[in-house]
């Protein structure tokens, strides 16, 4: 599962599809609102289902952040939920000493579906990254900003899919963040 039309419906679920997510983002006018930080998108090649992520992909993500570190105020990594907590934890150790946010997010229900949690997760992650108040790897999901190396997947079906049972959330998104 993942965020957006980047996933094409297959008989047994969704599969990553290059280029589709950019088109899906263009259809969300709120991403271009005046209050939103300016953003850009870099796409991994090849796209993978998160259940197929390995240390190799963690290294690629960390290198992508390092290569573009000076050009951006923060980073949002869109990731499938199956291994998002593992990736967030690994990146938190690989990218120690950050002066900028690296926020991982995704969705339980892809944005290509009528009902999806992806839009809010994406928009709120961009707002948090753009604010620049967080200086570490975090996971944002279902209204909670969690420390990357303290997050764990709690539910495969619920929209509150991640928790940090032994450490408080860094922020809660309600009327304000």
Tell where the protein language model's regions lie, with residue ranges.
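Short, glycine-/small-residue-rich phosphate/pyrophosphate-handling segment
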Residues: 111-151
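Glycine-rich oxoanion-binding loops at beta->alpha junctions
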Residues: 38-68
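Short, small-residue-biased leader/transition segments that mark boundaries at the very start
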Residues: 1-7
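Accessory alpha-helical/coil subdomains and C-terminal extensions
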Residues: 21-33, 147-177
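Gly/Ser/Thr-rich loops at beta-strand to alpha-helix junctions
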Residues: 5, 79-85, 144-146
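Short acidic, glycine/serine/threonine-rich loops at helix termini
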Residues: 8-12, 88-89, 114-117, 147-154
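Short Gly/Thr/Asp-enriched flexible loops that form oxyanion-binding sites at enzyme active sites
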Residues: 78-100
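Short beta-strand segments
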Residues: 77-79, 103-106, 138-143
